[in-house]
Amino acid sequence: VISTNNMSRMIRVSLSVNIAVLIPVCTVLILNIRPLVDVWGPATPARGILLSMYLSILLLSAGLWLRRNPMLVAPLLAMQICYKLTTPITVGSLTNPVVISNIAIAIVHAVTLWLIVAHLRASAK
């Protein structure tokens, strides 16, 4: 049986990781801070779209941190796991710093998502 405390703790961890990572990342992208911004490439519409996605995840994470509803957290984490685990393929590298951090964060989110699903399944019985 998955305890509510373990699930809630990991939800806080995942959302906190999102917030802690995305505040500086969005700041770097918005202010075009060099040399850090070079990891994401030059300012282009594609980078603007990426920033929009990052800002959306940041805002959702902050809102969900205040109201930790597992049914709302689960789809956010599932989407992040998918996009983070596909970045090595789309970037074509396992050594890019963004790819490396994406894989690490996906692992954390996968544990959280597993706990949410296990808890919800146990609650449904």
Predicted regions located by residue number:
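Membrane-helix boundary elements
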Residues: S3-P45
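Membrane-water interface at the C-terminal end of transmembrane alpha helices
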Residues: A106-K125
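Membrane-interfacial, low-structure loops and terminal tails that flank and connect transmembrane helices
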Residues: V1-M7, L120-K125
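Core segments of alpha-helical transmembrane spans in multipass integral membrane proteins
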Residues: A20-C26, P42-L66, P75-C82
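Membrane-embedded alpha-helical transmembrane segments of multi-pass integral membrane proteins
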Residues: N18-L31, L60, M79-T90, A104, ...
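Membrane-helix boundary connector in multi-pass membrane proteins
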Residues: R67-I100
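Non-cytosolic membrane-interface motifs at loop->transmembrane helix junctions
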Residues: D38-G48, P75-L76, L94-I105
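Alpha-helical transmembrane segments
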Residues: M10-A20, I49-S52, L72-L76, P97-I100
